[in-house]
UniProtKB/Swiss-Prot annotation:
Belongs to the DEAD box helicase family. DDX46/PRP5 subfamily. SMART domains: DEXDc, HELICc. This is DEAD-box ATP-dependent RNA helicase 45. Residues 479-647 form the Helicase C-terminal domain. Residues 1-14, 88-108, 196-219, 697-706 have a biased composition (Acidic residues). Transmembrane segments: none annotated. It is an enzyme of class 3 (hydrolase). Its EC number is 3.6.4.13. Residues 854-879 form a coiled coil. GO terms for molecular function: ATP binding; ATP hydrolysis activity; RNA binding; RNA helicase activity. The keyword Coiled coil applies.
């Protein structure tokens, strides 16, 4: 047994030696191939240089003599060169040879034969290789077909008239095409190409004349900040011939028809219903009277729904009649079935959906959880009817959603942001809205509050105009009313119940506390309530949620976070844990309107249990105090004196006109850049310029067209001297007339302004004083001209770009190469001001200040900075679920992978180009046991890893 074991060991050692030998032989063969290729490249470059010298010599001879037909020689050279081994179309390691090779090819081509060494090497290479070279296989399969296409395009261009073949520099059309392609390739790479080639790419005067570099900052901001909402083209319905469909599917039964007006009014009063509109159908009493199919009625019976709820009793006949409807009802009032049942009946009345068709029914909801809930309710009825329903929402795998849409679905339940993503993907080939004839917007008030107005508007614009539209909302604020007027046609309004009021079983406590005292108070509340049950803390932003979670972890409190950036499975798990036994609600950040406060506080005190809610508010947030005081009064709770004082003080300011009421919320944070905002932006910019002392004249108004570049330094000194001379002339004239007026220099560009005392003793003393003052001004202007030399400066606003774009554009790794290349100084100025926050009197939004010795250097720097910003914005826009709603997109990103071996598990971390680590989902790959860790970024340097 021992001898056999020894033999096995020897065999393993022998196999290891053989393997090492094979590796060495393979390495040697690759080295030889590399050396051969290097020698080929060297010989080819030398031959190119000789050909260039020969071409120049021919040009000189042609210019001196009668002129030899260089074009014919060049054509012969091209045909001969096609038979030689060259590196045309490949990237050379040395950039200096690129431009030389292009000039040589354009002037005369390659006419001389390559050295015999290269030819011998070409012949011997296939004999030495036992198999096809991978590079040659790649070239023959991928590159050469593309080269053939380009040659065909060039040949077609060469067949054009001679006047169109070349430019003023004598370059051929082929040269222009190749230069344009390479130029586009360099720009697409997103890197600064320094050296001669960079100058040719970025300093081309022709490009500066008519290219995109002349666009002003406003146009640049509008183009770069164009969201997926704006990239979704608006459909021209006049050019589409839609198939007709039937809306009215309701037949009123005899029992309902025989009801008198008084009976209907009494019945609606008992149901707490209020309706507004013309020819409103009467409410029903039983399910049989609704006009639904027998299969739907059987499913309703199996689910145990005995009779319609108030909103269902009135909404079903209205929607089944084909009328547009507005339903104002609280959450949990049964409004989901009020639009789901008519939608199912509407879908069954239409031709079946085939692959490639879009949905017939479209339901939009604000949150993922509500989408899942509506989808679950529809599935209960759709199975018996043979109807497919797809839920489209963020935080989950988009691939499965796309595959289900491609197979065909009659009903789609979606969040607006993810639906825009799907419609923009693959140029709209995945799905479309051409067949949507039944549109539902559920909880429209919450969608506006979350900033979905741009997405909703664009989706509605892309559906057919004669659709049936249903809108449900907990309240009916002005923003929702404006949308209803736009998208609904003669709607019927249904209101169920009264105004939302906080449950009287919930004890509400409002404390006036500054920001720096809230965390300690929160710890005190946790110490008191932690053992009694679960606690829910509300904050304004995702970042604050994550930072507060980290702080509570450090204090030893086990807790979970819930926000839009979390994975869907994490959200569902967290919600499942907090569905019951919730005892305390803490509004760490004050709600911004009354309804939001009611929704937050209403999470506790369910099923007749007592609840407790604590809300923090500071003196700076006094605009929200009246809503809190009103909520306490309506729920019959005592209003604290300090809160009442805050509310009274703010309302007094509103009456005086120094403050403006904050409204009812529901403005959202979505990006809505229309013409009115464009004009408001320009007006604010001009007002800010006047505040900082800039004179508003014609040159300032035209600065946008010139890129905003202005002259400074020496030019300012010249203006100061000219203004001083004008002031001297004016002062002398006034002194001569002995006017008792006070003369003051009005030079805005100089450093000193000296008043002259009125009622001077005599004219001579006044004139001498004026002359002395003017001499001082002229001297200061000359000193300024020497200290501050003539230069150019421009500004670039970056405050409104995404966080990753701002970080990238202000980092020294980005600014350093641009400054070295353009010889312009770039500094970051201003402070970051979030969207929605009012800019202070002495504040400016974050911007880059660019100054350089020449106007060209400043323009180059600004153009390159714009390119970097545009790349970052496009990168963020292309991420799944990154429809811009004024918040930084939290989504899965792709970069390069780094494997970290941890025992039998492997951690894969995804790093972006700028070094930021992002969250990725755990998964298993084939036979590998791979566990991906969630990496939460606390700051650029420190991060925590959790499974």
């Amino acid at each position: 047994m021992e001898e056999e074991e020894v033999v096995v060991v020897v065999d393993e050692e022998e196999s290891e030696r053989r393997r090492q030998k094979m590796i060495e032989e393979e390495k040697k063969r690759l080295d030889e191939e590399m050396e051969l290729r290097r020698r080929r490249v060297k010989e080819w470059q030398e031959q190119k240089r000789l050909e260039e010298e020969e071409a120049k010599r021919r040009e000189q001879e042609a210019a001196a003599g009668a002129g030899t037909p260089a074009a014919a020689a060049g054509a012969d050279g091209d045909s001969n060169a096609g038979k030689k081994w060259t590196l045309d179309g490949e990237e050379s390691d040395e950039e200096g040879y690129k431009e030389d090779s292009q000039n040589a090819e354009d002037d005369g081509g390659i006419t001389a034969d390559l050295p015999s060494e290269v030819n011998d090497a070409n012949v011997a290479a296939p004999m030495e290789e036992d198999e096809i070279d991978p590079l040659d296989a790649f070239m023959s399969s991928m590159v050469l077909p593309e080269v053939a296409k380009l040659e065909t395009a060039v040949a077609s261009m060469e067949s054009m008239p001679a006047s169109n073949m070349g430019d003023k520099n004598g370059k051929s059309a082929k040269d222009a095409v190749s230069n344009g392609d390479k130029k586009g390739q360099k720009k697409a790479m997103g890197r600064i190409m320094q050296g001669d080639d960079s100058d040719s790419d970025y300093d081309d005067d022709d490009d500066d004349e008519g290219g995109s570099k002349d666009e002003d900052d406003e146009e640049f901001m509008k183009r770069v900040k164009k969201t997926k909402v704006e990239k979704l083209a608006i459909v021209d319905h006049s050019k589409i011939e839609y198939q007709p469909f039937r809306k009215n599917l309701y037949i009123e039964v005899k029992d309902i028809t025989m009801m008198t007006g008084e009976e209907v009014a009494t019945y609606r009063k008992n149901l707490e219903l209020k309706v507004h509109g013309k020819d409103v159908p009467k409410p029903i009493k039983t399910w049989v009277q609704s006009g639904l199919t027998s299969k739907l009625l059987d499913t309703i019976k199996k689910l145990g729904f005995e009779k319609p709820m108030p909103i269902q009793a009135q909404a079903l006949p209205i929607i089944m009649s084909g009328r547009d409807c507005i339903g104002i009802a609280k959450t949990g009032s049964g409004k989901t079935l009020a639009f789901v049942l008519p939608m199912l009946r509407h879908v069954k009345d239409q031709p079946p959906v085939v692959p490639g068709d879009g949905p017939i029914g479209l339901i939009m909801a604000p949150t993922r959880e509500l989408v899942v809930q509506i989808h679950s309710d529809i599935k209960k009825f759709a199975k018996s009817l043979g109807i497919n329903c797809v839920a489209i929402y963020g935080g989950s795998g988009v691939a499965q959603q796309i595959s289900e849409l491609k197979r065909g679905a009659e009903i789609v339940v979606c969040t607006p942001g993810r639906m825009i993503d799907i419609l923009c993907t693959s140029s709209g080939k995945i799905t479309n809205l051409r067949r949507v004839t039944f549109l539902v917007m559920d909880e429209a008030d919450r969608m506006f509050d979350m900033g979905f107005e741009p997405q909703i508007t664009r989706i509605v614009q892309n559906t057919r105009p004669d659709r049936q539209t249903v809108l449900f909302s907990a309240i009916f604020p002005r923003q929702v009313e404006i949308l209803a007027r736009k998208v609904l046609t003669k709607p019927v309004e249904i209101q169920v119940g009264g105004r939302s009021v906080v449950n009287k079983d919930i004890t509400q406590l409002v404390e006036v506390r500054p920001e720096n005292e809230r965390f300690l108070r929160l710890l005190e509340l946790l110490g008191e309530w932690f053992d009694r049950g679960k606690i829910l803390v509300f904050v304004h932003s995702q970042d604050k949620c994550d930072s507060l979670l980290k702080d509570l972890f450090q204090r030893g409190y086990p807790c979970l976070s819930l926000h839009g950036g979390k994975d869907q499975t994490d959200r569902e798990s967290t919600l499942a844990d907090f569905k019951s036994n919730l005892e305390l609600v803490v509004n760490y950040d004050v709600p911004n309107h009354y309804e939001d406060y009611v929704h937050r506080v209403g999470r506790t005190g369910h099923a007749g249990r007592k609840g407790f809610a604590v809300t923090f508010i500071s003196d700076e947030e006094e605009r929200y105090a009246p809503d809190l005081a009103k909520a306490l009064e309506l729920s019959e709770q005592a209003v604290p004196q300090d809160l009442k004082g805050l509310a009274d003080r703010f309302m007094a300011k509103v009456k005086q006109g120094t403050e403006q009421a904050h409204g009812t919320g529901y403005g959202g944070s979505g990006f809505k850049f229309n013409e009115e905002e464009d004009e408001a932006r320009r007006s604010a910019k001009k007002a800010q310029a006047r505040e900082y002392g800039y004179e508003e004249d014609k040159s300032d108004s035209d600065s946008d067209e010139e890129g905003g570049v202005r002259k400074a330094g020496g030019d300012l000194a010249a203006q100061a001297i000219a203004a001083a001379q004008a002031a001297a002339t004016l002062a002398a004239a006034k002194a001569a007339s002995n006017a008792n007026q006070q003369v003051q220099s009005t030079n805005a560009g100089s450093l000193l302004s000296i008043p002259v005392v009125a009622n001077a003793p005599n004219n001579e003393a006044t004139a001498r004083a004026l002359q002395a003052a003017l001499n001082i001004q002229q001297n200061l202007a000359r000193i300024q001209a020497h200290v501050v030399p003539e230069h150019y400066e421009v500004e670039l606003d970056i405050n409104d770009f995404p966080q990753n774009a701002r970080w990238k554009i202000t980092h020294k790794e980005t600014l350093g190469p641009i400054q070295d290349w353009t010889e312009a100084a770039i500094t970051t100025r201003g402070t970051f001001i979030p969207q929605g926050k009012i800019v202070g009197a002495n504040e400016r939004k974050l911007y880059l200040f660019i100054e350089g010795p020449t106007e060209l250097s400043v323009k180059k720097a600004k153009s390159e900075l714009k390119r970097v910003l545009e790349d970052c914005a496009n990168h963020a826009l292309n991420l799944p679920g990154s429809a811009q709603t004024g918040k930084t997109a939290n989504s899965e990103m792709q970069g390069f992978l780094v494997k970290v071996f941890l025992g039998r598990w492997t951690a894969i971390l995804v790093f972006l180009d700028d070094g930021v680590i992002c969250n990725i989902r755990a998964e298993k790959l084939d036979k590998w046991q791979v566990r991906v860790f969630y990496v939460k970024v606390a700051d650029p340097l420190g991060y925590s890893i959790t499974e």
